[in-house]
Amino acid sequence: VMSTIGHVKLARFLAKFQRDYHGVELEVSEASVQELKNRLEQGDLDLAVLNPLEGLGAAFRVHDLYSERYVVVFAPDHRLATLNAIKLVDLSQEPYVDRLSCEMRDLVMGACRERNVSLYARFRSEREDWIQSMVLARIGFAFMPEYSVTSPELLQRPLIEPAVARTVSLASVPGRPYSPATAAMVRAAQTFDWPG
């Protein structure tokens, strides 16, 4: 699983899968998109849940699971808390918490440059729990996928102008036969009521 995927939604799917398919053992590990691709190609993984940002090419079979918007998250007393949605230009000069493992980071930073939006990262981390804790501690705001926000204390507003979204997909290697458990997982993922 890509490390930026919201675990709550995925856990609901995995719980239903476990109820429907007793006896199937699951192992979940986190990695970057590149590492997941490598492990799939080498046969170390049967399936990967990831964002095929620029496509995975013919080397992979991809089943889209759901799409999610990027939101701006901040502490409840933040000056932007009264807004229903946030434009990128609203964030210029705001203290920022940088999600280093975000696969969409370059895209968002490019949109900032195009609009002359200046962000100063006061804190950087690859860990989603640290990012949310620092935002809650009022270090700054963060951009996050809407289903990855797990702290109920944080406020979140959709990012507009530009709106940014990602697709979360299930990837496998075409031509490689599925084990019965893997085939069951693929069928279950295709019929699950995502995002969960």
Regions found by a protein language model. Name each.
Residues 94-115, 178-186, 196:
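Secondary-structure junction motif
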Residues 59-70, 74-96, 180:
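Flexible hinge/capping segments at coil-to-helix
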Residues 37-38, 63, 89, 132-133, ...:
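Alpha-helical segments flanking ligand/cofactor-binding loops in enzyme cores
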Residues 23-27, 118-122, 167-169:
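Residues at or immediately flanking beta-strands
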Residues 32-37, 41-45, 51, 101-155:
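Hydrophobic hinge/microswitch elements
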Residues 61-71, 142-146, 153-168:
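Short beta-strand->loop
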Residues 1-56, 124-127:
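Central regulatory/effector-binding core of bacterial HTH transcription factors
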Residues 9, 158-196:
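A late-sequence structural motif
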